[in-house]
Amino acid sequence: MAIETLTEGGFNALPGKTLGNQFNYFSGTDSDRAADLQKMLDNGNVKAIFCARGGYGMGRIIDQINFKRFRKHPKWIIGFSDITVLQTHLLSRYKIASLHAPMAAAFNDGESGNEYICSLHNALLGRKANYTAAGDDYNRSGKASGMLAGGNLSLLAHLIGTKSDIKTKDKILFIEDVGEYIYNVDRMMYQLKRSGKLKDLAGLIVGRFTEPKDTVIPFGQDTEEVIRDIVKEYNYPVCFNFPVSHDKENYALKIGVHYKLAVSETMTHLKELSEKKS
């Protein structure tokens, strides 16, 4: 469905060799998947790499990839969830932007014309993002501008101490996750805090934490309360329940690009800025 929709939208689609394959939990062996990604990164005719889905597996192959040619001729890497590994690696090591956005699987629900997939289409056409979201009782009001960084909370926590570790100073950080126990969200947020990832932010965007789980003995807080309390000592604006998630409500966000964030109790406004000159 994604290939059909993209073709109808004027894009030419080139399926990867491992698309639709299966090797245990993965779409191929590590060497096959790495070779497939490498080929797409190096192909000068490919202008964007659209990941089919997330799940797990990028961390197994990231160190096998040679980015030498890609760094000279970068292209959009589109995806989220497990793709956070690749996107964070590209920004932290090479200052290359990427698109945190719906993946191919999102086209299969019969809603390929929804505003979130349209936001991806707009990004690919070079249109600047300008999003307004509903307010939230937990919002901490304020304004900020800075480079956008972030992705899936689990992956961001797991990348700490690796070559792909996220750099957050003066950035607007966004986080989201799915199917996590509340105590684990607490643990991962403290991992970010203790490693210095939360103290020097320009702002924080808390996306959706889809299908949260609680333990038999209740944790005593929901995920929003956990995050609110962990960052309460800092002064930057924080918004909650922003439409970035594992659900269909998932706006395209350009990691590595500058945005302006305005947060109030009644709404959140996120606007992409013109590129800064180096």
Regions found by a protein language model. Give the residues of each.
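ATP/nucleoside-binding phosphotransfer catalytic cores, i.e., glycine-rich phosphate-binding loops
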Residues: 208-278
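Short internal beta-strands
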Residues: 14-17, 79, 201-208, 239
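Buried hydrophobic positions in well-ordered alpha/beta secondary-structure cores of metabolic enzymes
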Residues: 49, 82, 156, 204, ...
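ATP/NTP phosphate-donor binding region
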Residues: 1-45
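Short, acidic/small-residue loops that bind anionic groups at enzyme active sites
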Residues: 65-89, 97-103, 234-237
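N-terminal glycine-rich "phosphate-gripper" loop used for MgATP/nucleotide binding
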Residues: 51-59
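Conserved anion/nucleotide-ligand pocket segment
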Residues: 95-161
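Internal helical hairpin/lid segments
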Residues: 167-223
